[in-house]
UniProtKB/Swiss-Prot annotation:
It is found in: Cytoplasm. HAMAP family: Arsenate_reduct (MF_01624). This is Arsenate reductase. It catalyses: arsenate + [thioredoxin]-dithiol + H(+) = arsenite + [thioredoxin]-disulfide + H2O.
């Protein structure tokens, strides 16, 4: 039996959706093929890589991609992670379930380097917690 497809989307496929893809592969990988993309492709943020490494998830081989309409149309579940992606996400066929899990963009955090780093860790943990809830409840 083929796996279901989950597609995580955000603006630049740099931080939030990359972290979601990493968590998704770790937590949902038995039942789901996990992908991520952005409205634009900004490249992997080094702090996203570092934050995920702290929880033993390696995302260095993931790529920053724009939305692939083939994956979008084959997906079972599409999750937008920011308002921009929610507003600009292309139409999907009726069978594709869509949901919005909003998280702040850690790349836009203000303050000292330490404060900015803390935001990356917090967003990483919130995304991981949300995916764990999804794994248990399907919602």
């Amino acid at each position: 039996m083929s796996k279901k497809i989950i597609y995580f989307l955000c603006t630049g496929n740099s931080c939030r959706s990359q972290m979601a893809e990493g968590w998704g592969k770790k937590i949902l990988g038995e039942e789901w093929d996990v992908y991520s993309a952005g409205i634009e492709a900004h490249g992997l943020n080094p702090n996203a890589i570092k934050a995920m490494r702290e929880v033993d998830i390696d995302i260095t081989n993931q790529t920053s991609d724009q939305i692939d309409k083939d994956i979008l149309n084959k997906a079972d579940f599409v999750v937008t992670l920011c308002g921009d992606a929610k507003d600009k996400c292309p139409m999907t066929p009726p069978h594709v379930k869509r949901d919005h899990w909003g998280f702040e963009d850690p790349a836009k955090a203000q303050g000292t380097e330490e404060e900015k780093w803390t935001v990356f860790q917090q967003v990483r943990d919130k995304i991981g917690d949300r995916i764990k809830v999804f794994a248990k409840t399907g919602e």
